[in-house]
């Protein structure tokens, strides 16, 4: 007796929506970026061309959201979003995708004593996440060199894998069975892509010119970021 089957199974669901907003008088998005730049020891131009500085910090420097200023005769690193005493903050992250496995299986019974089975699985993965973050001045002061900043990020990962499973059941008696199963290592080949952008309105900072500036990640990397490709292996097992 022989059995052949085809199956499509949803192994994981990544769909998620995360939204929150509120007011903050303690910290800002740009604060850790300013700390990173300050600890690097670089000038602004050197930081913009360094691989040791994160892309987000470079975007903050490019738009003058993070800058240097002379305060009480000392040159210091500043984050302009820390100037207002109160900030409106909002975060919106939308994630979609999942992992679906397509499998092909076959089973065979021999002499009512041996039962053999095998399956090939092809998991297909996709996850996509769009993130938007915004901070704005909640004080109403139009002359403190910060109106708002907005950061957006797009991340995508896709991949396909392979696995194999085989099993044997031996039934010498109706009431007695011996079984053995072999699960091959799971092999996944994945590709990731990423891009981001940041905009800041610094009000009268460059008056009479506009205080608004924006930058895409591709501007700082000389073009779209290369896709990241890698393989993921999980151990096989014998049961």
Segments (PLM) and residue ranges:
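Outer-membrane beta-barrel porins/channels
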Residues: 1-239
């Amino acid at each position: 007796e022989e059995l052949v089957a085809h199956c499509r199974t949803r192994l994981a669901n990544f769909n998620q929506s995360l939204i929150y907003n509120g007011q903050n008088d303690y910290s800002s998005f740009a604060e850790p970026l300013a700390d990173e730049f300050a600890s690097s020891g670089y000038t602004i131009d050197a930081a913009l061309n360094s691989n040791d500085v994160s892309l987000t910090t470079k975007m903050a420097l490019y738009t003058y959201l993070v800058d240097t200023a002379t305060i009480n005769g000392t040159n210091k690193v500043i984050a302009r979003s820390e100037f207002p005493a109160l900030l409106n903050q909002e975060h919106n992250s939308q994630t979609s995708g999942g992992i679906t496995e397509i499998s092909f299986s076959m089973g065979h019974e021999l002499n009512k004593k041996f039962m053999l089975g095998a399956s090939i699985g092809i998991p297909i993965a996709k996850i996509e996440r769009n993130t938007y973050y915004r901070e704005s001045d909640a004080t109403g002061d139009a002359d403190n060199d910060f109106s708002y900043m907005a950061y957006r990020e797009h991340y995508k990962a896709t991949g396909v894998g392979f696995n194999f499973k085989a099993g044997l059941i031996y039934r010498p008696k109706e009431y007695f069975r011996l079984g053995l199963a072999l699960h091959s290592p799971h092999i996944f080949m994945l590709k990731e892509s990423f891009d981001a952008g940041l905009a800041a309105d610094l009000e009268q900072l460059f008056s009479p010119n506009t205080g608004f500036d924006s930058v895409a990640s591709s501007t700082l990397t000389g073009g779209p970021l290369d896709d990241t490709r890698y393989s993921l292996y999980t151990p096989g097992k014998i049961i």
